[in-house]
Every structure is written in structure tokens, then in C-alpha cells.
Amino acid sequence: MPMTLGYWDIRGLAHAIRLLLEYTGSSYEEKRYTMGDAPDYDRSQWLSEKFKLGLDFPNLPYLIDGSHKITQSNAILRYIARKHNLCGETEEEKIRVDILENQAMDVSNQLARVCYSPDFEKLKVEYLEQLPGMVKLFSQFLGQRTWFVGEKITFVDFLAYDILDLHLIFEPTCLDAFPNLKDFVARFEVLKRISAYMKTSRFLRTPLYTKVATWGNK
């Protein structure tokens, strides 16, 4: 039985999950929910099923794999990663995984707050001012490694790729001063299964966010 990934028909919190499912060659199908247009942003497609799926904390995204029913995007990522030994092996690697997992979520939330705000134009200016410093930290953390944890890819590389690509859409020059990050993005995109997936109609680079967002909703 293929796994079922449920989420809105956007990129959002499912991007790294979809990429990891593709990279690992996992058998899965998607249930994509559509949100209505303004001003109501009707969510009935999702709400009509929300409490009928047997989820402990009903939310999107969710992953159903037989008797395993999982919500929270990072919990889903870790579940898939454990099946394929992509969580780091040594204690040092696991520490780096944990740090980057949480740092990526922080940055993702910061950008989302800007993009969902009615004060987007004002907040964008402030965000762009601090962006080089934030990107520099990612560059330093990667260093000369092939992947963020070492020479072997782990699930946090999928999170890091998502974050960096999001910011390239937000500000296309943001990685210009950081060649190791540009190389990382290029290295990730030429992975055989990732490259193949990106050429399919199933691949969603955009919309980044739901229709409620001020920016990134198309």
C-alpha cells in the first residue's frame, strides 16, 4: 500500500517531504486540498475530513502509512528518514541534524510571518537588511562539506534546500556572496531522482503559501 501525504495544493510545509519521498523512491500518493478564494478562503475540503482520519493532532501536512498516522512536518520527515538511515550516524552528525532541523524551522517561520503580513512591504525591507547575516550563518555551518552534516546526505539537507530556494525566490541575489551555498543548491538539484521529479507536472515550486498570504500566494 502506498503512503498517503495530505496537504494543501501549494509548496508550503510539504516541499521537503515531497522531495524526500521522491529521493528515497518511496511509494506514495498525494491528497491535495484546495482552499477557496478571498474573502472567505473556504477550507471545507480539508475541514470535512480533518477529524475523520484518525490523526492524534489533526493538521496539514499528514502522512498515513498503514497503521502509522503522523502529523507535524518534521515528524513526517524523520519518519521517512529513519527508514532510509538519513538521520545521521555519529553523535556529532546527529547534533548537527538537530541544530539545522530547528534552525531551518525558525527561518521558515520568520519568512512566513513577513509574507503573510498586511505590512509586507515594510517588513520586507527589514527582513532584507538582516538576510545576509542569516545566510552567512548557513554558509559557515556548511563550510567545505558536501552536505550539511558531512559527506552523506541527511534529511536536513532537504530542509536546507527548501529554505535556500525559498529565499532565492524572495531575493534572487541572496546567495551570490556565498559560493558554497550556490554549489549546494546546484548539487541537490542534479540528484538523479530530484532532477527527474522537478521535470514532472507533480512538482510544485510555487505557490509558496496559501491564498491568505500577501506575497507568495501564486
Swiss-Prot record:
CDD domains: GST_C_Mu, GST_N_Mu
Reactions the enzyme catalyzes: RX + glutathione = an S-substituted glutathione + a halide anion + H(+); 1-chloro-2,4-dinitrobenzene + glutathione = 2,4-dinitrophenyl-S-glutathione + chloride + H(+); (13S,14S)-epoxy-(4Z,7Z,9E,11E,16Z,19Z)-docosahexaenoate + glutathione = (13R)-S-glutathionyl-(14S)-hydroxy-(4Z,7Z,9E,11E,16Z,19Z)-docosahexaenoate; leukotriene C4 = leukotriene A4 + glutathione
Cell location: Cytoplasm
Disulfide bridge partners, by residue number: none
Spans through the membrane: none
An annotated GO cellular component: cytosol
Assembly information from the UniProt record: Homodimer.
Parts forming coiled coils: none
GO terms (BP aspect): glutathione metabolic process; long-chain fatty acid biosynthetic process; nitrobenzene metabolic process; xenobiotic catabolic process
PROSITE patterns registered for this protein in UniProt: GST_CTER, GST_NTER
All copies of domain GST C-terminal, residue ranges: 90-208
Keywords: Cytoplasm, Lipid metabolism, Lyase, Transferase
Residues engaged in binding substrate: Y116
EC number(s) stated in the UniProt entry for this protein: 2.5.1.18, 4.4.1.20
SUPFAM superfamilies: GST C-terminal domain-like (SSF47616), Thioredoxin-like (SSF52833)
Purpose of the protein: Conjugation of reduced glutathione to a wide number of exogenous and endogenous hydrophobic electrophiles. Catalyzes the conjugation of leukotriene A4 with reduced glutathione (GSH) to form leukotriene C4. Can also catalyze the transfer of a glutathionyl group from glutathione (GSH) to 13(S),14(S)-epoxy-docosahexaenoic acid to form maresin conjugate in tissue regeneration 1 (MCTR1), a bioactive lipid mediator that possess potent anti-inflammatory and proresolving actions.
Binding residues annotated for glutathione, in chain numbering: Y7, W8, W46, L47, S48, E49, K50, N59, L60, Q72, S73
Residues of the GST N-terminal domain: 1-88
Family as reported in the entry's similarity comment: Belongs to the GST superfamily. Mu family.
Pfam families given in the database record: GST_C, GST_N
Tissue: Widely expressed.
Name of the molecule in the record: Glutathione S-transferase Mu 4
Domain of life: Eukaryota
InterPro entries xrefs: Glutathione-S-Trfase_C-like, Glutathione-S-Trfase_C_sf, Glutathione_S-Trfase_N, GST_C, GST_mu, GST_superfamily, Thioredoxin-like_sf
Molecular function GO terms recorded: enzyme binding; glutathione binding; glutathione transferase activity; leukotriene-C4 synthase activity; protein homodimerization activity
